[in-house]
A protein has these predicted regions:
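PP2C/PPM-type serine/threonine phosphatase catalytic domain
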Residues: 1-128
């Protein structure tokens, strides 16, 4: 998930308030090492219901490790039906803990910036 590649797909979810309307988000994702770096420290999840970008920080190895650790924790959002906000918050906290737990003897500690959306099936209807 960290090397340059593309992901394209579609997802569906039931819309209880309007049985004839089913949201079908279309999505794509890609990452690229760019011109300045030799190692890609970025990654993403693009599997419904989670669409998340992670930007690793802390130098080549540290940034890459941080991205992998964060994506490892956040990956649980792709295998479940999200029915409450706490599930997302707890998963992001687990990702932060996974990054913090990475040992580092370098000048810069590993870190990661996480941004994304999760399609949640709340009692009042689907929401991002």
């Amino acid at each position: 998930m960290i090397e340059s590649h593309d992901a394209v797909g579609a997802a569906t979810m039931n819309a209880p308030s309007a049985p004839c309307v089913v949201p079908v988000p279309r999505f794509g994702a890609a990452t690229d090492v760019g011109r300045l770096r030799s190692v890609n420290e970025d990654g993403y999840l693009a599997t419904a219901p989670a669409f998340i970008v992670v930007d690793g920080m802390g130098g080549h190895a540290a940034g890459r490790s941080a991205t992998r650790a964060a994506l490892g924790a956040l990956g649980s959002l792709t295998s479940t039906r999200v029915t409450d906000v706490d599930t997302v918050v707890d998963t992001v906290r687990a990702a932060a803990a996974a990054v913090t737990a990475i040992p580092s003897h370098a000048l810069y500690r590993p870190g990661a910036t996480v941004a994304g959306v999760v399609l949640a099936d709340l009692a009042e209807g689907p929401t991002w």
